[in-house]
């Protein structure tokens, strides 16, 4: 097992990465202020892992309740969030009852947001069951639900007490979900580590074949980079915005196509292709480098073409992005492979060109 520590001005917490961690309750107990927990999962994950976790906790004297939500990005909304509150209130959960997120990014985001709101702040722990959640959404304290006009527009920064990334939980992950997680892994190489990017190119076949050592290294390196950035800029006032590489386009795809039609990682992948194309048009990277990005994303089993939408629709969707400042959409682009930068605004003609060529 590998343990990383995310250290912030007001708190710190461990990120445990390894095999067979789900039932290692000793990793959880130090972070429970009371022997009471409420596990939040979904209809896909719960039949696989909920009973194992609940029994392991109860065997150590922890009183456990659970709530099982419908699965999918389309359920990341007020109505589903209220199911968590209903379960907590009907079960007389206290402020020191620890919420445990057992699921992917949607479950983690919603559980964290519920914890931030419940009695003005209850502790929570992340046990991510998808690659995307293990490498990205479970770390850093971003919690949110979607709104029809934009993704993750209603939420809070609220840090977990611990993150438990068990590689064995990825064994049941569908291939499409695994590829979606690889999009976020690729993102880290593109935005800040050219050496890691080269490693991904050399090891993509192993990752897609679920090689345990390769997956653990990919999760470790991704979490190291995420933790370092969050430690420097917890509330996304500066460098943390670089973690949104591919996301300005990607969130527009998710909203434009309807939440759930494209997986988040798929939309980010197509968004990174567009970001690389824009960077090449600006002369920041070569066209051969933009093609290198496209090839790696394709090798991960991810889409390299964005859905066809009028440029006006793209602009309208992106106008609701959280990175908009003074009415201007900000894009995360590539100054070079391994170095991302923020660019305020893109010429409409340039947008037209890259969308036409990559949709």
Swiss-Prot record:
Highest taxon listed in the record's lineage: Bacteria
Residues involved in Zn(2+) binding: 184, 247, 264
Residues that bind NAD(+): 71-76, 105-109, 129-130, 142, 151
EC number: 4.2.3.4
GO molecular function list: 3-dehydroquinate synthase activity; metal ion binding; nucleotide binding
Compartments it resides in: Cytoplasm
Cofactor: NAD(+); Co(2+); Zn(2+)
InterPro entries the UniProt entry points to: Dehydroquinate_synthase, DHQ_synth_AroB, DHQ_synth_fam, DHQS/DOIS_N, DHQS_C
UniProt key word DNA repair: no
Entry GO CC: cytoplasm
Keyword Cytoplasm: yes
Keywords tagged on the record: Amino-acid biosynthesis, Aromatic amino acid biosynthesis, Cobalt, Cytoplasm, Lyase, Metal-binding, NAD, Nucleotide-binding, Zinc
Associated pathway: Metabolic intermediate biosynthesis; chorismate biosynthesis; chorismate from D-erythrose 4-phosphate and phosphoenolpyruvate: step 2/7
Gene3D superfamilies: 3.40.50.1970, Dehydroquinate synthase-like - alpha domain
Co-factor note (free text): Binds 1 divalent metal cation per subunit. Can use either Co(2+) or Zn(2+).
GO terms, biological process: amino acid biosynthetic process; aromatic amino acid family biosynthetic process; chorismate biosynthetic process
EC top class named in words: lyase
Catalytic reaction list: 7-phospho-2-dehydro-3-deoxy-D-arabino-heptonate = 3-dehydroquinate + phosphate
Record-linked Pfam families: DHQ_synthase, DHQS_C
Function in brief: Catalyzes the conversion of 3-deoxy-D-arabino-heptulosonate 7-phosphate (DAHP) to dehydroquinate (DHQ).
Family from the record: Belongs to the sugar phosphate cyclases superfamily. Dehydroquinate synthase family.
Name of the molecule in the record: 3-dehydroquinate synthase
